[in-house]
């Protein structure tokens, strides 16, 4: 069974046992999180929510709080002017523990 969840303005297709890197969530390593479920599928026909499904839960456990590799943004004009900026986007790695429909 799989589900499509919404978090951080994005949608992810997950199943039990998956590890997903999502936008940073508040919480400590080992903490529990619940997600909004948009769609559930697997056996037979998929159920689609409007916008979410009532009575369907996806639970996860926070495995890590970390940052992605550095992203460099470099701009150069014809006259010799340059600008270099970079950042590391924080993320939360979550282990999906249960998908209940």
UniProtKB/Swiss-Prot annotation:
Protein name according to UniProt: Large ribosomal subunit protein bL21
Assembly and oligomerization: Part of the 50S ribosomal subunit. Contacts protein L20.
Role summary: This protein binds to 23S rRNA in the presence of protein L20.
Similarity comment: Belongs to the bacterial ribosomal protein bL21 family.
GO cellular component: cytoplasm; ribonucleoprotein complex; ribosome
The encoding gene: rplU
Natural source organism: Anaeromyxobacter sp. (strain K)
GO molecular function, one term: structural constituent of ribosome
UniProt signal peptide: none
PANTHER family: 50S RIBOSOMAL PROTEIN L21, LARGE RIBOSOMAL SUBUNIT PROTEIN BL21M
GO annotation, biological process: translation
């Amino acid at each position: 069974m799989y589900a499509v969840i919404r978090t951080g303005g994005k949608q992810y297709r997950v199943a039990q046992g998956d590890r997903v890197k999502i936008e940073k969530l508040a919480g400590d390593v080992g903490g529990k999180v619940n997600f909004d479920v948009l769609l559930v599928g697997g056996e037979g026909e998929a159920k689609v929510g409007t916008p979410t499904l009532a009575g369907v839960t996806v639970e996860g456990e926070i495995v890590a709080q970390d940052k992605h590799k550095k992203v460099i943004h470099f701009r150069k004009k014809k006259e010799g002017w340059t600008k270099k900026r970079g950042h590391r986007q924080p993320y939360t790695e979550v282990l999906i523990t249960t998908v209940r429909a």
